[in-house]
């Protein structure tokens, strides 16, 4: 699979956190997987754990 960067959007949509550096993710936060521009309003822990595997 291609490498993708995973960033998490907290309360401020302009504030991004790299999931690789902050695993204390709120389950209600939003995130963007850069590269394919996938966006979601709700985070599922399993989705994040899977996405983290692609963080370069």
From Swiss-Prot:
Lineage, top-rank taxon, reads Viruses
Q: Signal peptide: which range, if any?
A: none
The UniProt entry lists membrane topology as: Single-pass membrane protein
Q: Name one GO biological process term.
A: symbiont entry into host cell
Post-translational modification note: Does not contain disulfide bonds.
The UniProt keyword set, sorted, is: Host-virus interaction, Late protein, Membrane, Viral attachment to host cell, Viral envelope protein, Virion, Virus entry into host cell
| Chief location | virion
Q: Any idea where this protein resides?
A: Virion membrane
Expression induction or repression: Expressed in the late phase of the viral replicative cycle.
The Gene Ontology CC terms held by the record are:
membrane; viral envelope; virion membrane
| Further comment | Immunodominant protein.
What does this protein do, in the record's words?
A: Envelope protein that binds to heparan sulfate on the cell surface and might provide virion attachment to target cell.
Q: Which family, according to the similarity comment? A: Belongs to the orthopoxvirus OPG108 family.
The name this protein goes by in its record: Envelope protein H3
Q: Which organism is it from?
A: Vaccinia virus (strain L-IVP) (VACV)
């Amino acid at each position: 699979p291609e490498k993708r960067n995973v960033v998490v959007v907290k309360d401020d949509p302009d504030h991004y956190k790299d999931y690789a550096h902050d695993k204390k993710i709120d389950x209600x936060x939003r995130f963007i997987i850069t590269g394919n521009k996938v966006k979601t309003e709700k985070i599922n822990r399993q989705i994040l754990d899977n996405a983290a595997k692609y963080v370069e």
